[in-house]
From Swiss-Prot:
Catalyzed reaction equations: L-aspartyl-[protein] + NAD(+) = 4-O-(ADP-D-ribosyl)-L-aspartyl-[protein] + nicotinamide; L-glutamyl-[protein] + NAD(+) = 5-O-(ADP-D-ribosyl)-L-glutamyl-[protein] + nicotinamide; L-cysteinyl-[protein] + NAD(+) = S-(ADP-D-ribosyl)-L-cysteinyl-[protein] + nicotinamide + H(+)
Triggers of expression: By 2,3,7,8-tetrachlorodibenzo-p-dioxin (TCDD), which is a by-product of industrial processes and an important environmental contaminant. This induction is concentration and time-dependent and is mediated through an aryl hydrocarbon receptor (AhR) and aryl hydrocarbon receptor nuclear translocation (Arnt) signal transduction. Superinduced by cycloheximide and by inhibitors of the 26S proteasome.
Record PTM text: Auto-mono-ADP-ribosylated.
Keyword Glycosyltransferase among record annotations: yes
Motif (Nuclear localization signal) on chain: 41-48
Ranges of Acidic residues composition bias in the record: 1-10
PARP catalytic domain mapped to chain residues: 449-657
Listed Gene3D superfamilies: 3.90.228.10
Chain ranges of the WWE domain: 333-411
A GO term for molecular function: cis-regulatory region sequence-specific DNA binding
SUBUNIT field: Interacts with AHR.
Descriptive protein name: Protein mono-ADP-ribosyltransferase TIPARP
């Protein structure tokens, strides 16, 4: 409650804007002044917009921006500023029910209309859907039928499989749940502590029309202004301030008045200028790169580029050297949490350096090691994972380091409202990716080939089709690959689906033949999805001719002279030779492992199941360990199919800010 006097307020008349004057206000004062009266007036609270309201308003905003309807409502504060300039509405009207005089100019929301002539337009976004946290258990372990959008060849040009492999129409509508998943990062070196966001929206959202039913034009516009205010990004210059988790979830009611940082991600990097001592944000394109590199405990220094000059940043001391333009670096983050399953909190990992490098330990053990170092103890005893450990500190003091758990934008998309996610739909338990065997694609009776395949001309032996990030197959492959290959060391560039009709037919018929001799669980585990590392020069050959056991021995033949496949991508990475451009190549293949036995170096084929019988069936594959196999060796080329090609690269130690 607040006390207010009822002195008559002058009427504010807002004139249309003109180049010569801004927001002129004509005052009409009455001739008589009434006596002052004391009264009580309840302070109005800011409206709280729910997640559903925020999502339903986006198509309205998009329509207004595209049509230019807001050109007379919003204008740039400074026409000479760059694309990060703030925008404000010309008719200055606050969002309270009772209007008052125009507020201060710095209280308006950030908005860039589509019609604004901005140098350096935002790039096209590639949205992604239903992205669980890395390690989220996959309920359906199959690579499901997908819809590949885009232009494909005309089906009338071929006859090979008129009723089997259907061409995919280029007019397939994009799922409304997929469209607004990704924000377009603004290019440029620094954003002036303010960020802009542009969504690709589905204007057919029925919630939008329902939301504005029975509302006047003025009330609807106020609701739009309220939304814009809540979507504004800002950072503060002071240290010790955390990122607002309510804003990440789309529930912060304070807008630009929030005392916490409003950023796109749960982490945000800034660098301080030496002359002004002001913190400025690193370019949006570099935020994830810098975070990815920082999360690796092996990295202490990072090379930075800005304005044609190179300099270095110390990631431990958070200082910048070999330049006079900047002197410090800082990382803004959300509050810490001891639960790694929390998407919005920062989870810190603790590392201790030994003879073999940086080894991760629980925080309690690290604290114990720190205490032993400070007291000069020669050894530390502790129990971890039901085992007793002894660390000897006789010859050196153990170095301790902490780094945050890395979460990529791809993983964060469905959880963050700032990236267009839907937290209510993505609130799944965050656990390690299941190691269960992935079932094969469901092939309908009307289509012998996977429904995800696009049309290919009969003259083509094979094609490689890029997998969209919103496809479920992409997410499954992403989680399988990064289950053993750290995200902070390697980054997936592209995933290609291999379509080879001849090899697919051979593989399916061999699978049917093997299944006839199996029953129950044996049929389920007959087919596995395994990794195979290789070099760029043989990728196309494998896509056309398949994995050839006859050319084995290029890397290893310890368990037999055949084609090698591994459960873990980290093992296959050892045989993935880097190309001249720094790109690695790895296959995720379908493999019919069937019945297996221990392999040996001299085997050119699997041994018989019954050695005493001449007509005995042979084992289908050989393994490195009978009880917990990690490596499978195949001796027949019809027992495998090159399903996907994964292209990835090592995280660079240089970032352009």
């Amino acid at each position: 409650m607040e006390v207010e006097t009822t002195e008559p307020e002058p009427d504010c008349v807002v004139q249309p804007p003109s180049p010569s004057d801004d927001f002129s206000c004509q005052m009409r004062i009455s001739e008589k002044i009434s006596p002052l009266k004391t009264c009580f007036k309840k302070k109005q609270e800011q409206k709280r917009l729910g997640t559903g309201t925020l999502r339903s308003l986006r198509p309205i905003l998009n329509t207004l921006l595209e049509s230019g309807s807001l050109d007379g409502v919003f204008r740039a504060r400074d026409q000479n500023r760059d694309e990060s300039s703030l925008h404000e509405h010309i008719v200055k009207k606050p969002l309270e029910i009772n209007p008052s005089c125009p507020p201060a100019e710095n209280s308006m929301p950030v908005l860039i209309p589509d019609g604004t002539n901005v140098e350096g337009q935002l790039p096209e976004a590639h949205p992604s859907t239903d992205a669980p946290e890395q390690g989220v258990p996959i309920q359906d372990h199959s690579f499901p039928p997908e819809t590949i959008s885009g232009t494909v060849a005309d089906s009338t040009t071929g006859h090979f499989q008129t009723d089997l492999l259907h061409p995919v129409s280029g007019d397939v509508p994009t799922s409304p749940d997929c469209v607004d998943k990704v924000m377009d990062y603004v290019p440029g070196a620094f954003q002036d502590n303010s960020f802009t966001i542009q969504y690709i929206l589905d204007t057919s959202d029925k919630l939008s029309t329902e939301l504005f039913q029975d509302k006047s034009e003025e009330a609807s516009l106020e609701l739009v202004f309220e939304l814009v205010n809540q979507l504004q990004y800002h950072t503060h210059q002071e240290n010790g301030i955390e990122i607002c988790m309510d804003f990440l979830q789309g529930t912060c009611i304070y807008g630009r008045d929030c005392l916490k940082h409003h950023t796109v991600l749960p982490y945000h990097w800034q660098i301080k200028r030496t002359t002004t001592q002001k913190w400025q944000s690193v370019s949006n394109d570099s935020q994830e790169h810098l975070e990815r590199f920082y999360c690796n405990p092996e990295n202490d220094r990072m090379r930075m580029k800005y304005g044609g000059q190179d300099f270095w940043a110390d990631l431990n001391a958070m200082t910048v050297f070999e330049t006079t333009e900047f002197d410090q670096l800082r990382r803004l983050s959300t509050p810490p949490c001891s639960n790694s399953n929390s998407i919005y909190h920062t989870f810190w990992k603790f590392f201790c350096r030994d003879h073999f490098g940086w080894r991760e330990y629980p925080e309690s053990v690290v604290r114990l090691i720190e205490e032993a170092n400070s007291r000069g103890l020669k050894e530390v005893r502790f129990m971890m994972w039901n085992n007793h450990y002894i660390l000897h500190n006789s010859f050196f003091r153990r170095e301790i380091k902490r780094r945050p758990l890395f979460r990529s934008c791809f993983i964060l998309i469905p959880y963050l409202q700032t990236l267009g996610g839907v937290p209510t739909q993505a609130s799944l338990p965050l656990e390690a990716t299941s190691s269960q065997i992935i079932c094969p694609d469901g092939v309908t009776s009307a289509n012998f080939y996977p429904e995800t395949w696009v049309y290919m001309h009969p003259s083509q032996d094979f094609i490689q089709v890029p997998v969209s990030a919103e496809d479920k197959s992409y997410r499954i492959i992403y989680n399988l690959f990064h289950k053993t290959v750290p995200e902070f060391k390697y980054r997936i560039l592209q995933i290609l689906r291999v379509q080879n009709q001849f090899l697919w037919e051979k593989y399916k018929r061999k699978k049917e033949y093997m299944n006839r001799k199996m029953s129950g669980r044996d049929r389920i585990i007959n087919e596995r999805h395994l990794f195979h590392g290789t070099s760029q020069d043989v990728v196309d050959g494998i896509c056309k001719h398949n994995f050839d056991p006859r050319v084995c021995g290029k890397h290893a033949t310890m368990f037999g002279q055949g084609s090698y496949f591994a459960k873990k991508a980290s093992y296959s990475h050892n045989f993935s030779k880097k190309s001249s451009k720094g790109v690695h190549f790895m296959f995720l293949a379908k493999v019919l492992t069937g019945r297996y036995t221990m392999g040996s170096h001299g085997m050119r084929r699997p041994p018989p199941v019954n050695p005493g019988s001449v007509t005995s069936d042979l084992y289908d594959s050989c393994v490195d360990n009978f009880f917990e196999p990690q490596i499978f060796v195949i001796f027949n080329d019809d027992q495998s199919y090159p399903y996907f090609v994964i292209q990835y690269e090592e995280v660079s130690n240089t970032v352009s800010i």
